[in-house]
């Protein structure tokens, strides 16, 4: 019994399907018997075809800054009414909707005006939804490459204003009218990008008179998108490494000159920065329209490192000066030994002028310059036998020479220590200056734009 009932139900469903298919086949045959897809679907020639256009943005695929091309995945919804494709559902088994290839019916010749790859037309490989009232809904998916003027002045903290302009290619406003479905594109199914954020989006309808046809307007719908770049990737991979290179450059002046590694560290930083710039150059838009912020900062970092190398050479040269090659000018001693250490609180630094005076030598305590000539018997009543000895006198002269030589060496060492002290003061000054310039330079390049972006939000 159950088996018989199941067979009857199956036969009933199969028969309904056959009859339904038969109704749809008959309907399509009747609709397209005398249908001409080239002719506009209007009652009279003066009537206008009204097309409602809606854009649904699915994905922002790519923004090519170099070629100024934006690739997007969209669905372009188009609705219009075809007076030649109406029917009475009661005559066709209650069929109210059918799906037919878009190439079999008349469709508006909408194109993307600012197309960048030469493929202006919309693909017709999808089907349309046709209702018994003659209303047609066509939502073909498409990947468009549109031209967008990319302004890289504030890269990577930049915003781009891009647009997509859709309009008919041959029908003027007297034959075909296009209206936007709403004042904004549909982003309900938009897949967020890891590099860009959709900050604002709108659409406008324009009536344009072209020079070829000045008497009749052509309509277009333009969708505007404001794209804001997400700068985290560039902050982590470009800006922070450049900032660390700058700080490392400043630390060159914290390294003692006697270590002999100042130039080694400076050259190593320069080589590392050069290799780093070669690696990240592909991340920066290669355009000559403007110098991006990140390009300015990289140039600042390069100049910063080169300046540190030049100044390091001067500091090392100052450190190794001696009285035999350079005489310290009074103003240098006044500024770098007496004035600046007090201003910069170098109270714990041992200065050459504060060193203990060496104890007097035998030659300084004993004036032997009068030991010359002959001593008469009337001068003294007693004369030491040692003074009569020429060897003793020669020894005293030798001691005097040694004392003068030691004094000259002490003065030379003191002058060398003064030059080293000047070099050390320069190192401390330059350390503070370079660290300050590093911070101020970074803020000067990026702070203004970041504040402006926060104010806009």
Curated annotation (Swiss-Prot):
S-S bonds: 148-162, 212-213
GO cellular component terms given for this protein: acetylcholine-gated channel complex; neuron projection; plasma membrane; postsynaptic membrane; synapse
Full protein name: Acetylcholine receptor subunit alpha-1-B
Gene coding for it: chrna1-b
Glycosylation-annotated residues: 161
Assembly: One of the alpha chains that assemble within the acetylcholine receptor, a pentamer of two alpha chains, a beta, a delta, and a gamma or epsilon chains.
CDD domains: LGIC_ECD_nAChR_A1, LGIC_TM_nAChR
Primary site of residence: membrane
Function as written in the Swiss-Prot or TrEMBL entry: Upon acetylcholine binding, the AChR responds by an extensive change in conformation that affects all subunits and leads to opening of an ion-conducting channel across the plasma membrane.
Top-rank lineage group of the source organism: Eukaryota
Keywords for this protein: Cell membrane, Disulfide bond, Glycoprotein, Ion channel, Ion transport, Ligand-gated ion channel, Membrane, Postsynaptic cell membrane, Receptor, Signal, Synapse, Transmembrane, Transmembrane helix, Transport
């Amino acid at each position: 019994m159950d088996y018989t009932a199941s067979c009857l139900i199956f036969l009933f469903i199969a028969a309904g399907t056959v009859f339904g298919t038969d109704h749809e086949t008959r309907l399509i045959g009747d609709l397209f018997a005398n249908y001409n897809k080239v002719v506009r679907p209007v009652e009279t020639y003066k009537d206008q075809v009204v097309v409602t256009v809606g854009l649904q943005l699915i994905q922002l695929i790519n923004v090519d800054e170099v070629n100024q091309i934006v690739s997007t995945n969209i669905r372009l919804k188009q609705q219009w009414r075809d007076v030649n494709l109406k029917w009475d559902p009661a005559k066709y088994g209650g069929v109210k909707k059918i799906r037919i290839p878009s190439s079999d019916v008349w469709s508006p010749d909408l194109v993307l005006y600012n197309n960048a790859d030469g493929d202006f037309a919309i693909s017709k490989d999808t089907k349309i939804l046709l209702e018994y009232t003659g209303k047609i809904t066509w939502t073909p998916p498409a990947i468009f490459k549109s031209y967008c003027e990319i302004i890289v002045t504030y890269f990577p903290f930049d915003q781009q204003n891009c647009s997509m302009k859709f309009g008919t290619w041959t029908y003027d406003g007297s034959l075909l009218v296009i209206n936007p479905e709403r004042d904004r594109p549909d982003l309900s199914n938009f897949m967020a990008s890891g590099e860009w954020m959709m900050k604002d989006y709108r659409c406008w309808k324009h009536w344009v008179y072209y020079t070829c046809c000045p008497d009749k307007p052509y309509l277009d719908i333009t969708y505007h998108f404001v794209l804001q770049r997400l700068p985290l990737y560039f902050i982590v991979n470009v800006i922070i490494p450049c900032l660390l290179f700058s700080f490392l450059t400043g630390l060159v002046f914290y390294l003692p000159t006697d270590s002999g590694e100042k130039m080694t560290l400076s050259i190593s930083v320069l080589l590392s920065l050069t290799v780093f710039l070669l690696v990240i150059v592909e991340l920066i838009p290669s355009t000559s329209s403007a110098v991006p912020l990140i390009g300015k900062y990289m140039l600042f970092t390069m100049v910063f490192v080169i300046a540190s190398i030049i100044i390091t050479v001067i500091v090392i040269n100052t450190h190794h000066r001696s009285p035999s090659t350079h005489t310290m000018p009074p103003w240098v001693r006044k500024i770098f030994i007496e004035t600046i250490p007090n201003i910069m609180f170098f109270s714990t630094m041992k200065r050459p002028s504060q060193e203990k005076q060496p104890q007097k030598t035998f030659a300084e305590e004993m004036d032997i310059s009068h030991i010359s000539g002959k001593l008469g018997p009337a001068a003294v009543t007693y004369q030491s036998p040692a003074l009569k000895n020429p060897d003793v006198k020669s020894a005293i002269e030798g001691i005097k020479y040694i004392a003068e030589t030691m004094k000259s060496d002490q003065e030379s060492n003191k002058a060398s220590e003064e030059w080293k002290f000047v070099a050390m003061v320069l190192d401390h000054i330059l350390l503070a200056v370079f660290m300050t310039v590093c911070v101020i330079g970074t803020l000067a390049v990026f702070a203004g734009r970041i504040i402006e972006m926060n104010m806009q939000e």
